[in-house]
Amino acid sequence: MKYSISTLITVLILFVACQKNLRSDNITLPDIDISGSANGIVTLPQTVPSIVRKTFVKYTKLIAPNGKSIHFLAQDGWTEDQIMHARNVMQHILTSYPGSTYGNDKTGVANSMSDKRATMVLFNDTDELEKAFNGGLADLDHSMQDLRSNESPAVGDEDYMAHVTRDASYEEIWHLVHDYGIIPTRPDMIREMRVANDVAVEKGWRAWPQDEPQEHPNEYMGVLIDNYYDLWVIEPKLYEAQDYEPGPDGTTHFGSYFANSRAHVETKDPLGYTVIEKFFHPYLTFNAQLPTDFKGTFSLSLDKSQAYTYKSQYLIDVTLRGSNNANLRGNRLGNNLTGNSGNNIIHGAGGDDEIDGGGGDDGAVFIGLSDEYEITKQEDATIVSDVQSDRDGIDRLSNIEFIHFSDKKIEIN
């Protein structure tokens, strides 16, 4: 019952696809220029067909290696931060993962999607989705996958920081990639997914929709992705704006899957874990630009007292925006940490980091004594090298006015 709405939507979109195959006057999006927008999001121009403009107001895209577009259409209930997050997740999934079995070069996956005019349709809610398809959107000759604003918090917004809403963006965007990128180009991956899914069923995985077994490996991968990035270690409070009813401890997705973290997937579902590792980066590759009104400290280091850090621990590249005084704490992956025009305190927290304070009076934090570091000034940066191994690493500082050591604070030009 929990997935009846998703099942209805799947049937509706499949019906739309079948109807399009019968048409000879298919409608498509024109080329939309986003180069004039700082964040790549624009208001839909008048050149866009009316069946699109009567539902959507915003647009962005990713350009595949073949020069064609993968599209995003958004309704008015989506903030631009949310739209950027959806685009970031798509970019992450399509970023090549050198040395991996299925993700070493994802050019073919992205090209296949753009050839099929793959499009994320970002609705406010399910009612708006049904209204749009019943009102003419079915005539748009694009391969579409829905995502709703009430299931897609943006990194750093209030919902994300309080860990309120289940983030469905990874799963739903995966479905678009799977249907129009993976199926046409990765037959070996599809076979491996099916084997892993079948073994997981024997262990208790309850796939949905129950009467569509051909879709079970696709849904299974969506569940694996969520757990690989630890989105369910702390269960969300809301699921599509409805109170979430938890399943048994250690499970996710209303108890339908028997593991709730990357570590548990590795031990309880090794075949599924192996498939994920063959395509997905172990960390999130996109630059997360925090909301302009963000205040406080955003941490990329796991802190079990802060539920959001189970998600943020896989980020490596974060940018503060706006002018509020705010702080960043990195992790041990080697980060790109960028401040805003306010006063920022930035701690790399391990690994070799690129730290840019931006405007304002900014400080970089190191946990050791000042005489345990070597400081080298370059023309456009200051290099701080920790002489103790496995601690602060080697950080490159730019637009940083102060360095905070455990024993003193020094000023740098």
Model-derived regions: residue spans:
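Bacterial Sec-dependent N-terminal signal peptides
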Residues: Y3, L8-V11, F15-S35
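N-terminal low-complexity, Pro/Thr/Ser-rich intrinsically disordered segments
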Residues: R23-A64, G250
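Active-site rim elements
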Residues: A74-G77, R206-P213, A259-A263
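Sec/Tat-exported extracytoplasmic proteins
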Residues: I93-P98, I173, V177-G181, I225-V233, ...
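Acidic/His-rich structured neighborhood in mature extracellular/periplasmic domains
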Residues: K54-K58, G67-A207
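Glycine- and aspartate-rich repeat motifs characteristic of hemolysin/RTX-like Ca2+-binding segments
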Residues: S301-V365, D371-E374, D380-R391, I403, ...
